[in-house]
UniProtKB/Swiss-Prot annotation:
Keywords from the named record: ATP-binding, Ligase, Nucleotide-binding, Protein biosynthesis
Keyword ATP-binding tagged: yes
GO biological process: translation
Top-level class of the enzyme under EC nomenclature: ligase
Described purpose of this protein according to its UniProt entry: Allows the formation of correctly charged Gln-tRNA(Gln) through the transamidation of misacylated Glu-tRNA(Gln) in organisms which lack glutaminyl-tRNA synthetase. The reaction takes place in the presence of glutamine and ATP through an activated gamma-phospho-Glu-tRNA(Gln).
Family, similarity comment: Belongs to the amidase family. GatA subfamily.
Lipid biosynthesis in keyword set: no
PROSITE patterns named among the record's database cross-references: AMIDASES
Family matches, as Gene3D superfamilies: Amidase signature (AS) domain (3.90.1300.10)
SUBUNIT field: Heterotrimer of A, B and C subunits.
Record-given protein name: Glutamyl-tRNA(Gln) amidotransferase subunit A
Active-site residues, Swiss-Prot/TrEMBL: 79, 159, 183
Single annotated GO MF: ATP binding
Length: 493
């Protein structure tokens, strides 16, 4: 069965088309793999065995009739904050206990319309707040990768840790994820997978549990660049139910792969050389520069002067929006309800019991920066900084730069239950240092595996593109992937 789960989406698509395998066989292979591995990895918080099998059966019938969709019979995992009709959707928070939506998110509806099969819902940091997938009410996810000669558990990154771990461990062919400050790209880098955060407005947010509405964007995590391109084509669409959705045709992203990068201008930002960055990250970056240079790209030094303000500004804007978005969870209509002596007490008891520590921390920060006395000093200034960050990128792109190459993360995956990080949230927030600028500016960014560190753990590079020019990112990421190769963890689970 493992030879079926080893297939990429592109390979499985070809075999299904040629009738060499059936969607039912492929789905059963994944369900068996999940049943065998999930206790160890904890990537799934709900597995939809019956639904997966009936969707696979319907796919086989469509294939037989010659009516196959673009993702016909491909088994996918869904991050737990996409609404899936009648299926567990809790953003891995206790406050949404027992919640099963009456409707389907636009992203998942697009995937099912193209014939994809749902295997279940994937673990994540609570309300997508975290960089290690340790804030989930359902417990942490374990990274399928381990350091050479070590049995120590590592984090898969966050918030889309379940998505990245499931893809890396071959517990789904691909997965949906979301990215507010790096939640697709950082876990992809930590697990040797490919993750793209599309331009803000490219993929509908309708039916996705909101964290920070002006930053959130859904995208895929996949095993390679081609699979990410295939998934993104199905996920992206115009959606009138999302006022930020953009009316632009969705290109065939897969067609961009293999196109030459000769003459493409790649910017290298000097501000991304941060103090204390491990030598192996710098080395990897140089390697990526060389790969693109060898393929004919022109490398230019650039400056993004406001980079150093991105992280503090992000941790004002994102919690501010979160405190507003999370105000709706009160125990009245759905989810957890803890009885109280009156309605105000019921609200308090429900929210106290329902939200985890990190969600509470961000709600408090957000409420503080939006309060009358501090709104101008913090929130307003952070929004001004955001405008300056966006302008930095606009200036660089105006000079003819096609894409920007940076590291994806400041380190490889770190240990589960790391005491230093547990006691110092700011240190944990530094994981997003290379990724938040992309969300602040609403740009597309892709993380692609580019090598292993000295301990045999995957490291990723990030490419940042012009708005709605994801094709350029796929094109350049494919060049890096071809040069660096693909990386799969040794099975221990």
């Amino acid at each position: 069965m493992s030879e079926l789960t080893a297939l990429t989406i592109a390979e499985a698509r070809d075999k299904l088309k040629a009738k060499a395998i059936t969607a039912t066989e492929l789905t059963d292979a994944y369900l068996s793999a999940i049943d065998a591995a999930n206790d160890a990895i904890n990537a799934y918080v709900a597995v939809t065995h019956d639904q997966a099998r009936s969707m696979a059966k319907a796919s086989d019938e469509r294939i037989a009739k010659g009516e196959a969709g673009a993702l016909e019979g491909i088994p996918l995992g869904v991050k737990d904050l996409f609404a899936t009709k009648g299926v567990h959707t809790q953003a891995c928070s206790h406050i949404l206990d027992g919640f099963k939506p009456e409707y389907e998110s636009t992203v998942t509806a697009n995937l099912w319309a193209d014939g994809a099969v749902m295997l279940g819902k994937l673990n994540m940091d609570e309300f997508a707040m975290g960089s290690s997938n340790e804030t989930s009410y359902y417990g942490p996810v374990k990274n399928p990768w381990r350091a050479k000669g070590s049995n120590a558990d590592l984090v898969p990154g966050g918030s889309s840790g379940g998505s990245a771990a499931a893809v890396a461990a071959h517990l789904c062919a691909g997965a949906t994820a979301t990215d507010t400050g790096g939640s697709i790209r950082q876990p992809a880098a930590f697990t040797g997978t490919v993750g793209i955060k599309p331009t803000y407005g490219r993929v509908s947010r309708w039916g996705t549990v909101a964290f920070a509405s002006s930053l959130d964007q859904a995208g895929p995590i996949a095993r390679d660049v081609r699979d990410a391109a295939i998934l993104m084509k199905s996920m992206a669409s115009l959606d009138l139910k999302d006022t930020t959705s953009v009316d632009l045709p969705v290109p065939d992203y897969e067609a961009a792969l293999g196109r030459s990068v000769k003459g493409m201008k790649i910017g290298i930002p000097r501000e991304y050389r941060v103090d204390g960055m491990p030598g192996e990250i710098e080395e990897l970056w140089q390697k990526g520069i060389q790969y693109l240079k060898d393929a004919g790209a022109e490398i230019v030094d650039i400056s993004l002067p406001h980079t150093k303000y991105a992280l503090p500004a992000y941790y004002i804007v994102a919690p501010a929006e979160a405190s507003s978005n999370l105000a709706r969870y009160d125990g009245v209509r759905y989810g957890l309800r803890v009885p109280g002596k009156d309605i105000a007490d019921m609200y308090e008891q429900t929210r106290a019991a329902g939200f985890g520590k990190e969600a509470k921390r961000r709600i408090m920060i957000g409420t503080y920066v939006l309060s009358a006395g501090y709104y101008d000093a913090y929130y307003l200034r952070a929004q001004k900084v955001r405008t300056l960050i966006k302008k930095d990128f606009e200036d660089v792109f105006a000079k003819g730069v096609d894409a920007i190459l940076t590291p994806a993360t400041p380190s490889a995956a770190f240990g589960l239950a790391d005491e230093v990080l547990a006691n110092d949230p700011v240190k944990m927030y530094l994981n997003d240092i290379f990724t938040v600028t992309v969300n602040m500016a609403g740009l597309p960014g892709i993380a692609v595996p580019a090598g292993l560190n000295g301990q045999g753990l995957p490291l990723g590079l990030q490419l940042i593109g012009r708005p709605f020019e994801e094709e350029t990112l796929f094109q350049a990421a494919h060049v890096i992937e071809q040069a660096a190769g693909r990386f799969t963890p040794a099975k221990w689970w």
